[in-house]
């Protein structure tokens, strides 16, 4: 049996992070978790690029532009979309998830979805480094593993 899997060694990998400025009090914690995890796994600080955009809705376009340049092994998306009283939540969540998935499939570059989609601010805070771990850190680990896996295929 031939088993192909990625490892968690980040040395030599180039990773882009696209983060929404909206709800940045949550996004900042996600970013800190992602960057710290990338560095702990050997990604050089100079090989981490961070692009800020106004909100989560704009993330797919920024991801597309970064992916088209072909300079990164993986892209991490970070942000927080919190449900409100209107249907805006569904519009943004669907646009982000389908947009980044399309870029990933079209380019072959792994795009990790670290945009929190929660019903409350409390849930978002929990997933940004308190009770429920840090989704930014989790995405960083997955980005390293996917980049290394794809290098073997």
Curated annotation (Swiss-Prot):
The active site is at 88 (proton donor). The keyword Repeat does not apply. 5-amino-6-(D-ribitylamino)uracil binds at residues 22, 56-58, 80-82, 113. GO terms for cellular component: cytosol; riboflavin synthase complex. GO terms for biological process: riboflavin biosynthetic process. It catalyses: (2S)-2-hydroxy-3-oxobutyl phosphate + 5-amino-6-(D-ribitylamino)uracil = 6,7-dimethyl-8-(1-D-ribityl)lumazine + phosphate + 2 H2O + H(+). Keywords: Riboflavin biosynthesis, Transferase. One of its GO terms (molecular function) is 6,7-dimethyl-8-ribityllumazine synthase activity. (2S)-2-hydroxy-3-oxobutyl phosphate binds at residues 85-86, 127. It comes from the Bacteria. InterPro entries: LS, LS/RS, LS/RS_sf. It is an enzyme of class 2 (transferase). The keyword Transferase applies. Its EC number is 2.5.1.78. Pathway: Cofactor biosynthesis; riboflavin biosynthesis; riboflavin from 2-hydroxy-3-oxobutyl phosphate and 5-amino-6-(D-ribitylamino)uracil: step 1/2. Catalyzes the formation of 6,7-dimethyl-8-ribityllumazine by condensation of 5-amino-6-(D-ribitylamino)uracil with 3,4-dihydroxy-2-butanone 4-phosphate. This is the penultimate step in the biosynthesis of riboflavin. Belongs to the DMRL synthase family. NCBIfam families: lumazine-synth, PRK00061.1-4. This is 6,7-dimethyl-8-ribityllumazine synthase. It comes from Herpetosiphon aurantiacus (strain ATCC 23779 / DSM 785 / 114-95). The lineage of its organism: Bacteria, Bacillati, Chloroflexota, Chloroflexia, Herpetosiphonales.
């Amino acid at each position: 049996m031939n088993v192909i899997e990625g490892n968690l060694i980040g040395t030599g990998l180039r990773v882009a992070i696209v983060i929404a400025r909206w709800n940045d009090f949550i996004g900042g914690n996600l970013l800190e978790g992602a960057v710290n995890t990338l560095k702990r796994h050997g990604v050089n600080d100079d090989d981490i690029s961070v692009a800020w955009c106004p909100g989560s809705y704009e993330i797919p376009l920024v991801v597309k532009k970064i992916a088209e340049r072909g300079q990164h092994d993986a892209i991490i998306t970070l942000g927080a979309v919190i449900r409100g009283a209107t249907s805006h939540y569904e519009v943004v969540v669907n646009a982000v998830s389908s947009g980044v998935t399309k870029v990933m499939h079209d380019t072959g570059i792994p795009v990790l979805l670290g945009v929190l989609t929660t019903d409350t601010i409390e849930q978002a805070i929990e997933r940004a480094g308190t009770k429920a771990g840090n989704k930014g850190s989790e995405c960083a680990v997955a980005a390293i593993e996917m980049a290394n896996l794809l290098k073997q295929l």
